């Protein structure tokens, strides 16, 4: 099986960049890994894009927006969970923009997806 650019950069992002260059905590690394596991499952099950054939060019703004909507509609995720998944995707595309400048426009489009306002819990005063 031929390695795709998405597989190569996602592997580097999760196993080298986050723990080494960024120094992220193990829980952050696991949360990011889980976010991309969900994205890959979404691509396979909803978009008919097999993970082993997924390329960076296919993971565009429209796909990410559909993924986020799927999280809310089908998995009943709250805005805060959706925003956590989006933060992982944003972080990856920020990394990718520097590693592969030819994707800068696509990266900027994905990075333009805003966080959704999440309900804040009421303040409890004594």
Please annotate each region the language model reported:
Residues 2-4:
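Blade/loop signatures of beta-propeller domains
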Residues 6, 31:
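Gly/serine-rich nucleotide phosphate-binding loop at the start of the catalytic core
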Residues 11-27, 33, 37-121:
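N-terminal core-binding DNA-recognition domain of tyrosine recombinases/integrases
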Residues 124-126:
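NUDIX/MutT-family hydrolases
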């Amino acid at each position: 099986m031929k390695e795709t650019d998405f597989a190569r950069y996602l592997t580097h992002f999760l196993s080298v960049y986050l723990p080494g260059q960024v120094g992220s905590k193990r829980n952050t690394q696991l949360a990011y890994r889980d976010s991309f596991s969900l994205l890959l499952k979404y691509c396979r099950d909803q978009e008919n894009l097999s993970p082993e054939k997924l390329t960076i060019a296919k993971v565009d703004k429209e796909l990410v927006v559909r993924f986020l909507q799927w999280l809310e509609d089908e998995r009943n995720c709250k805005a805060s969970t959706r925003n956590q998944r989006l933060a992982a995707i944003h972080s990856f595309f920020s990394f990718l923009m520097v590693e592969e400048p030819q994707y800068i426009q696509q990266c900027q489009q994905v990075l333009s997806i805003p966080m959704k306002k999440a309900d804040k819990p009421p303040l409890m005063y004594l």
